[in-house]
Amino acid sequence: MVSFLLGIAANDNWASVSGAKTAGAAVAATPTARLWRERLPWTCGPETVLEALAGESHLCCLSGVWAGGGAMVACEPLRVAGPDADPFATLDDLPAVDTAGVDAWGAVGGGWLGWLGYRLAERVERVPVAGPRPAPLPDFHLAYYDHLLRRDAYGSWWFEALITPPRQAALKQRLEHLRTLVGDQLAGSAGPRPTPLRLSAAVAQRHLHAVAACRERIAAGEIFQANICLRLEGEYSGTASALLRSALVHGRVPQYAAAFDTPAGGIVSLSPELFLRRLGRRVRSGPIKGTAHRPDDPSRAVLSLEQLQSSAKDAAEHVMIVDLMRNDIGRVCEYGSVYAPRRPTAEAHPGLWHLVTTVEGRLRAQTANAALVRACFPPGSVTGAPKVQALKVIAELEPTGREVYTGAVGYASPLAGLELNVAIRTLELAGGRAWLGVGGAIVADSNPEAELEEALIKARPVAAAVGTSVIAE
């Protein structure tokens, strides 16, 4: 397990990277940190804070229902996990925290924030994850922030920090610096827009062939279901945080939205789906499977919902993935503790209806974050059943490879636990380009043309949220 001293290099595996530290294979005892919380007199939204901090290193934001609601904004991390680190073990490299004399209710304090890309499946299931890499982003990005700005569910802003003696003076300076930057910002504005996100005729045709081939695999008994995806592409030269700012200004942010600026590029995840939420020994997942267009007209929206709820195809997709998620979580939970209701809940999202089921369990004693994530990664709702064989089928059939898309995005905190989304509806940004992956579950009675249209239905609200559109050639 990779472990580090807070603020102190443990050996020569440290190097300076863009103002942060990069961790290699250092092993050291993690000291106890002290929680510091200070309420701030701000009444603004996270879009204003993001615009004020636009020049800061490794700026990131989680917005929606993360850690109980509100938002968190962080920048200037203490260190960044290097390419040789174990990304799963890194999620456990957290300090013990002394909260004596501090109201810690709802606090995050700090921790690891970032993403785990889909290609990390190779480290978990030992199967090849093939396909081209159009977006030149790392397989994972995890940065340790010992301080952040937290907006709670009631709209109050807090400066939160995990203080160790070597960092006490520096963190006081950081608070004053952030006060000055945000205090001078009047209101957040929308950032630059990408060009329209295009689906080329060639990619669309390959997707149709992939869906048809997947149905043949199902008919042959190789798999029951696989999630087959494609990518749209556009031009964009701004930052990820600016793109999320646009979505926030337009009020089109789902439950598990996130943005990360890194030297290699960035991501904007407008995901509605919870992969894992762990607090103590309780763990929860919210797999989504079953989607329908939700028209603006209320009567047509109700009709669309009724059709979704009565769809045998969507019900079959959903039941299989819920069972898969129960099995994955059950690998690290106490026997008999995993529970899911018999019927899914229909949730309304921008332009869409989704069927969602909450799966819950109680982890076995001493279960680490790494063990939990490894047991469930990559998310079942974006792979298929049986999972390992579905991974192989996906690698063989999909027209483009996956990177951050369909992995997971979120945080690991010593106070707030672990929370990761499923990185769907996620834009990957690098080199002046923007890529959006979309797809859907393929089962025995899937229709290739209908599956292609469902992918575009999912893409359009994401494009609208960031001020652009979708063009299918």
What is each residue range found by the language model?
Residues 2-473:
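Extended alpha-helical targeting/anchoring segments
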